[in-house]
Amino acid sequence: VEVLMGGSGGELAFIPNELQVNAGEQIVFKNNAGFPHNVIFDEDAVPAGVDVSSISMSEEDLLNAPGETYVVKLDKKGTYRFFCAPHQGIGMSGIVTVN
């Protein structure tokens, strides 16, 4: 499953911002527009027992260039909220449901 980070028209958003995957399925977050983005999972909005540091990028790490990717697999069923640290204040976030 591919999630674009930034819209072709300059939108600061994850596209899609809601998705469903199977446990263990690969999710590829791809910088689409060349703004600096990252993927941080919200420690208060993931299934109990999930260590967000093992699935999130570091807040200091950024995908700067178009085409750069971050790949993650989520093994525990449930709902995970994620966001882009630099653009969280303007609502760049999303939800993935693992079935």
From Swiss-Prot:
Residues binding Cu cation: H37, C84, H87, M92
UniProt cross-references to InterPro entries, sorted A to Z: BlueCu_1, BlueCu_1_BS, Copper_blue_Plastocyanin, Cupredoxin, Plastocyanin
GO cellular component, one term: chloroplast thylakoid lumen
Membrane-topology annotation of the record: Peripheral membrane protein
Subcellular location: Plastid, Chloroplast thylakoid membrane
Main location: plastid
Cofactor: Cu(2+)
Residue intervals of the Plastocyanin-like domain: 1-99
Thylakoid as UniProt keyword: yes
Xref: SUPFAM superfamilies: Cupredoxins
Keyword hit for Aminoacyl-tRNA synthetase: no
GO molecular function, one term: copper ion binding
Record key words, sorted: Chloroplast, Copper, Electron transport, Membrane, Metal-binding, Plastid, Thylakoid, Transport
Record's function text: Participates in electron transfer between P700 and the cytochrome b6-f complex in photosystem I.
Family: Belongs to the plastocyanin family.
Protein name, entry field: Plastocyanin
Protein source organism: Ginkgo biloba
Gene name in the database record: PETE
